[in-house]
Structures are given as structure tokens and as C-alpha cells.
Amino acid sequence: MLKKYVLLLCLCAALFGKDWPIYKIGIHENVPYLEKGRNELLDVYYPADAKPDEKFPGVVIIHGGGWTGGQRDAAREINIASNLVRMGYVCVSIDYVLSQKGKGTWPRNFQDCKTAVQWMRVNAEKLHLIPDKIGCIGGSAGGHLSALLAVGGKDMGLEPTSPYGGVDTSIQAGVNLYGIMDLTKWHYMEKDGTPIEGKFRRPAFVGAKIEEDPERWKFASPINQLDKNDPPILQLHGLADTTVDWWQARDMKKALDEKGIENEMMLIPGIGHTFALQHPGNKNYPAEIRPAVFRFYDRHLKGLDDAACKEHYDALLAWEAAHPDDTLYWTLNINSGKLAKNLGKGRWIIERDGKEIEIQLSEKVSVKSEKEVTVADMADGQIVNGYGKRNEETDVTLDKLVILDKSYGRMALGNISFLNSTLKKTENGWSVETIRNGQQQKMLWPLKLSEKFKVFRRQFGTVDDLQVGMRIVQMNGKAAGELRLVNTVVLQGK
């Protein structure tokens, strides 16, 4: 049945449309883009097999996290970037200054987003970017900043003066995923997502209490920065969202309509907060979120009509059906350089930029073929990022576990997010320990493994010509799986 479906999609594309290329995903990580001395970085996602003369629209991806947390390489941001690259976009996923201990970072966080747009335009030639076709997208706090980036022009007086002073910061299409559009009216919700009239949240990032400086709060709200010349806006919001009330999208749409600004809104029944373009299990959300975002960008950044947008998406579906192992858009599993020498006990030498670098993969690594090695290991205390479900009590059923090589992780189970999660070996098997609210609350979640349990390991660093993905195929005391090595193209320069 699957083969017939793939054949049908391919025939339709051949008979009625153009030959739409579906691109390999390349990534260049840890790129400085702000003024000297700033630690925030960005990652570039790009079509790795593009022709030398091809040019692509760009998209700035802005992570969420309540303006106080989150990271550019979280699962949602990886999913969005990977999907867009497949469809022929160059993306940058950015870090920006975060609020700490109640201290406000407005408007520096917003200016960081503007600087990212400037960086893309300054580096347009290296990125194969069409400089006057740049969009933005973000979720939650990132949705707020994305919408503000779309509508907040020079008249706000917040254009960055360095390091790219004078470079255009405008974008041509903005996507808001469940972001706060009016900071003065961010409602608390009932358990089913129904907003509570008159009860409001008050984020600390603004830098002043609303009673002290109400104009500052209004100024930082996208809904108050609209202009008839603003670019098209797409909003997606779950009606079951208990973090950001869906009235935010509703009120923003009304304001956009009143200004005559082209916009679309999708309110999604039964969906809560923090969704990406796909379900972690690679199932589409009920409202077809992914094709809606593709269609919006294809129309406004590529100039396609609705028929061509559908052909483009159908081509992606056909490609994914024919390449099921290459549709895991939740972690890119990146390593750096070429595997050069096996030192034993999981230690390998890789070559990068003419230098030899030693890395630790696992104690059981052997070359399986030119592009594959096998690996087995799960270490107690390893930083993890998991996807699955939690029951009413304490158990977690995992479909996927990402093993990270950084000092932080993020565990997302349905609509629940935990920071700083680690694997723990207990008498009853593996568990995940999570820390919430600093050190105030620790929880140990026993793991149950679904029939489709997979583990991915991600090594962080600049990508040159090696993409690494580890897929665990069984759990028997210790993990056993395979590490896939795929050649990628280098994006030279910063």
C-alpha cells in the first residue's frame, strides 16, 4: 500500500507539476553574530546539496522559554529548521539575551533578533540567501519576538547600531506560534485552556512593573506596533493552551484586520502549548500545521500560488515516504569532521581543518560499512532530552530519548517541559531525574519504553563534513543500536 502511495504521489508530481527538489540538511553550528564579547550564538541550517548558483529565502527561528530560558537547539527549533531546509530555505536558529533573577532584558532581546536579520543580509552571498526574502518564526516567548520582529519597524527607534549598523532589519513574512501579542492582557487559564477574565500574568523581562510603567508594557506588545505596511502574519494557537491564552491570537487578528494587514489565523482544538511543525512521532497535528506554515512561506517568500504550494508539499510527502529513515526532524545528531582512527574503548580521532581531534563515542564502536558504525552505551547521569507520555502518577513512557553532550537538557513529555534532565540507574532500571525551579524540586520518573523506542546521541560542535545519527534498536540492560554517518557540505566562513 505504501509503495502504491509513493508511486501515486510521484506520478502526480511528474504529470502535473515541476520537479521540486527536496534538499539534504546541512548545519553550521555555534556561529557568533552579535557584537564582540557577547556569548549568544546562532546555528545555520542550509540546503547541503544546493547547486552553486541557487539562492533561497531565509527564516530566522526564535526559541521560546518565557524570555528567561530555552535554547536555539531545542527540539522544536531543530524540527522547524530541518523541515524548512528540506523545502528550500536557509534558516538561522538564534540565542538571544535572557532575563535572569527578575531583571528585564527588554529591548536587548528584541534587538538581538533584529541583529540576526542584519547578519543574514550581510552574509547573504555565503548563505546563498535572497536578501529581500526573509521570514521569521517563533514559539511562545519566541512567538512574541517573532511577531514584534515582523511589525516593529524603524519608527520604534530600536534599530541595532552595531555590529551591522544601518543594515535593513525588515522581514517579509512572520509566523507567530502561540505567542503573547498583548503583554498587558496575558490571561491565566482554566485547566481546559479557557481564559479567565481579569486575571493576568506579568512577565519580568519587561524590566518594570506594569503599575510603574504601563507604557513600557504597551510598547513591547506587538499588537500596539501595527502599521498598514507590515508584512503578512500567520498565527497558530492551540485552544487547549494553558500557558498562553488563545485570545492573544484572536485579538491580534482583529487588530491586523483593522489595519488592513494580510494575515491568517489557525485555532487548533485539543492542542496545547509548545507544539512544533510535527508530532515527535512524525505524525501531523490534527490541523495540518506543517503544510500551513510551508504554504504561507512558499506564497510570500517564493511567490508560489496555492496550486504550486500543494505540488511542492506533495513532492515532500513523496520523498519522505520513499526515505523514511531521513524524516527524523527532531535531532540532527551532529558530529564534527571525518572519522580517521579508532583508538579503542570508544575513543576516535577525527580530522577537521587539518587538525586531529579526539572524541568519545562509546566503549563499543566498530565500523559496519563506509557510512555506518555500531554503538552501545547508556551512562548513568547522562544529560537527556526525551519525548513520550506521562501518566497521572509518576511513570514516563518514552518513544525517543536524545542523549546530549552539554550541561543542560530539555525533556518534553506532551505539554510538560523539564529542564536539566539526567538518566539515573535505579534498582528497578532506568529513570529520568528532573530539576524544576532551580534546586527546589527534584523528581525521579521511572522510564517505560514504547515498542518504537529510539535513542539519539548528539555531539555538539561545528559541522564540517560529517553528520552522525545513532539509532537504538533494542534495550537489554544496555542499549544496542547503530550510528549512521552521512557526508554533508561545509558552509565556509562565519
Give residue ranges: language-model regions.
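Catalytic nucleophile-loop/oxyanion-hole region of alpha/beta-hydrolase
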Residues: 71-80, 92-131, 280-288
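Short substrate-entry loop that stabilizes the transition state in hydrolases
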Residues: 50-56, 62-104, 144, 156-157, ...
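Short beta-strand/loop motif that positions the catalytic acidic residue
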Residues: 229, 235-237, 241
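Mobile cap/lid helix-loop segments that gate and shape the active-site cleft of serine hydrolases
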Residues: 19-26, 150, 185-225, 231
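Conserved alpha/beta-hydrolase "acid-adjacent" motif
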Residues: 242-251
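Short, flexible, surface-exposed loop segments at domain boundaries
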Residues: 317-358, 368-448, 452, 456-494
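Primarily recognizes the serine-hydrolase "nucleophile elbow" in alpha/beta-hydrolase
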Residues: 118-190
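N-terminal cap/lid segment of alpha/beta-hydrolase-fold proteins
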Residues: 18-54
